[in-house]
């Protein structure tokens, strides 16, 4: 998948985030990125916190293993997830 790659022993994910959705879920690829809908609003970092929590649970890693590399205030985000491969991340999120 174009939205996931291995880099330095971790998976790097390119995401497109839609805050204030009806529920939190991964909905598929959009513009070369994995689109994730978040129920949280984009206020005071709530959407970023919800994204980290969603990815940690979905990928079976600790929240501390999920780091936002780029896109703190935008919809297009790059996230690094330690302790998992890109292939495992794709399998967990694309299903």
From Swiss-Prot:
The species this protein was found in: Anaeromyxobacter sp. (strain K)
Family: Belongs to the UPF0235 family.
GO CC field: cytoplasm
Protein's name in the database: UPF0235 protein AnaeK_1146
InterPro entries (alphabetical): DUF167, YggU-like_sf
SMART domains: DUF167
Organism superkingdom: Bacteria
Lineage: Bacteria, Pseudomonadati, Myxococcota, Myxococcia, Myxococcales
């Amino acid at each position: 998948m174009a939205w996931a790659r291995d880099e330095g022993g971790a998976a790097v994910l390119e995401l497109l985030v839609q805050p204030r959705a009806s529920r939190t879920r991964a909905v598929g690829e959009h513009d070369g990125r994995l689109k994730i809908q978040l129920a949280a609003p984009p206020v005071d970092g709530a959407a970023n916190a919800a994204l980290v929590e969603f990815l940690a649970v979905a990928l079976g890693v600790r929240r501390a293993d999920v780091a936002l590399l780029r896109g703190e205030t935008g919809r297009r985000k790059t996230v690094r997830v330690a302790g998992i491969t890109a292939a495992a991340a794709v399998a967990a999120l694309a299903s």
